[in-house]
């Protein structure tokens, strides 16, 4: 129970510490957090109109494709979801990750002179195209857990795209990067005409209108409206509009034009996929995450390792505390680089990676006074896995880290809780500028 004094400190700030300007915020309809205030506003509009957390999450995920195009992601991207239904107590992971194109085989890349998959930016970036999974996943959430129509959840993003949003500093900083300009020049049309003002970076606060994106969103919404009051049929035809109709045709043609591997057939065969989340326990809490088709288990592995340290005794954010947490994360990331992959396609010792005994062995590697240079050696989770008898794949990780670890840019995230206790979150990513 929080007493009156504690409540005051939470709301006004502890006067014995520097003020943060971030008091506790209370609400009655729900809470939403995202990477941009207009993304959050899209979801809050849905909550105030009577929608649930899942409706709001879908609305905000579509809105983020308009409000954060240079920052994080686009409709040509992917997303992972974690969903908790208060009524049933069900927790589900949902993959909106794009699968590889049918053309993307080792033999194909070798025939092009590549012994690893080339990623963007660059002339060979189209060879790394995957199926855009985020749209299918959003409609899957709306279909299974939502209450509102396609038009309801797409209206905020349509308005943002057609009427414009204010340009903001982070997005403009990305536009100033030479690789953004070169990518637009390499893959016309669209980028330079939409995001630049006669070749110059716009001023903060100027209007960014994305009419073509608005047209795609409106086309899906209108397709759903054509089904009348049948909400589920509306969702199905909106999904087909993107993956089987004119939009899929345009994506296939555009991919072919730039030498990409993605075809309309790849889109037609795509399905977002639900799965059971993986989990671990930490100090009495059960913590859930997606499996190794994401990097979600990194957090769970790190928590398992950190159970072997008295973080409270070390003191929050003391040098020793930060050192210990950092080293635990590095051990988990080393395993990520070596063993993570989609269990549907490659053998992964998921149970071994999340084994408490394995974590105990890894925890012993942390030197209390010295940081490991770069990433440490990956471990041997196969020893702790029920699949030990399987042939363990040879890790492709090299000591010293991968280029991905040097990236400064990240992605975006959306979390929603409604008044019924439903909780939903999404991490849409990729398909935007130098990430594509």
Tell where the protein language model's regions lie, with residue ranges.
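Internal maturation/activation junctions in enzymes
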Residues: 9-12, 199, 248, 252, ...
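Short loop/turn segments at secondary-structure transitions that flank enzyme active sites
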Residues: 87, 100, 293-295, 308, ...
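A short, polar/charged loop-to-alpha-helix boundary motif
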Residues: 104, 432-436
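Short helix-capping/linker segments at secondary-structure and domain boundaries
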Residues: 143-148, 224-226, 306-313, 336-341
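Extended C-terminal regions of large enzymes
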Residues: 289-297, 402, 417
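Noncatalytic scaffold domains of N-terminal-nucleophile
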Residues: 2-41, 45, 53-237, 242-294, ...
